[in-house]
Structure formats: C-alpha cells, structure tokens
Amino acid sequence: MILHAIVPDAATAGWAAGNGASVVQLRLKDVPTAVRVRVGREVIASVGDLAMIVMNDDVAAAEALGVTVHLGQGDPGVERATRAGIRFGRSAGTPEEARRAEAEGALYIGAGAVWATPSKTDTGPAIGLDGLRAICRAVSIPVVAIGGVDASNAADCVAAGARGVAVIRAITELPRLRALLEIAVADSGDGRER
C-alpha cells in the first residue's frame, strides 16, 4: 500500500513520514533548482529511512539529491532521467498516457485528478473512479490516485484498483488514511502488497 504525501518543506515531510507516509514528494513551485536541492537535503535529513523521497518536476534536483523524480505529462526530463539512471513517476489522466508512461519506464503512475481539487489547477477534468479504474487496468505498474482524495474516499480508490493514494490538503489525515487503507487492502482479498 502506498501512502504518498506531497509536502512543501522538511518539517511537514518528517511529520508525514512519521505518521504513515511511505512516499514523501517535495513540491516547490516557481523556485530555482538550487532552492529545491537545499530544501531536498533538509527533507532527506528529516525523513531518513522512513519513506521514499520524490522531487516534483526537477530532474536536476533529483539527480543532485539521488532521489526519484515525479514528472507531469507536460514536464520535460524523461530522457534525462533515464540517461542518468534516475527513477521517475509520471502523471496520467487517461489509460493511453498511463501506457505511454509505463513504456517510458515509469516506476509508478499518479492518476487523476480523480476528483476536482483546489490544490492543483493545471489538470484536465476530473477522471472519477471509472477513469481511475481504466488507468489501473491499463498498466502493470503501481497506480496512485491523486486529486481530491481524503479519508472519505481513499478506500474507493483502492477498490478501483489503485495501489495507494496521494494527498496534499488531506495530509493531516495521514494516520486515519493509513488505517483505512489497511482495511481496504485486507477487504480486497487479493493478498498483494499495495
């Protein structure tokens, strides 16, 4: 099960990792790479071995830090990440985008936005649970649901086939989300680590 917390700083990253996040993604918009590297070092120190660390959008920062990078559909860098041996995740809003990301070598898919959300306004229309289900069926790599996900609907995402959820606004619900997702995975009955 993947509980993916998208954070703005090291303090939030450390709290998230200590409260059940298995992945911590540093998302700093409109700042230079040098700032991302500096804050990324703080995140690494704060998180330690508690969670996988992901840098949002910046391949150069990910390379400098030795962490995974997450790339949206419009973000450049897949070729550079591949050449440098950097693991990467990809955003996808359709099964076709997900299949393309898997073919590129993506480690995971961030699928959504599942529901409309004010946290990320540069996405297409919400894909809903049917769209999430279609993406999950289209690929063999893990799919993480993002966009409007919180404690009230995270289990529905797992039931649709997601291996986990990503949260921004619902980060304060991490302990409850972890418990709910563990129940949802147990109820799925397939025995796979999600």
Which residue stretches match the model-derived regions?
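Conserved N-terminal beta1-alpha1 strand-loop-helix module at the mouth
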Residues: 1-75, 80-108, 130, 134, ...
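A short acidic, helix-capping loop that chelates divalent metal ions and anchors anionic groups
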Residues: 26, 62, 115-121
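Short acidic/polar capping segments at secondary-structure boundaries
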Residues: 114-116, 149-151
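Active-site-adjacent loop and "lid" segments of alpha/beta metabolic enzymes
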Residues: 121-126, 145
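Conserved catalytic/dimer-interface elements of ABC ATPase nucleotide-binding domains
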Residues: 166
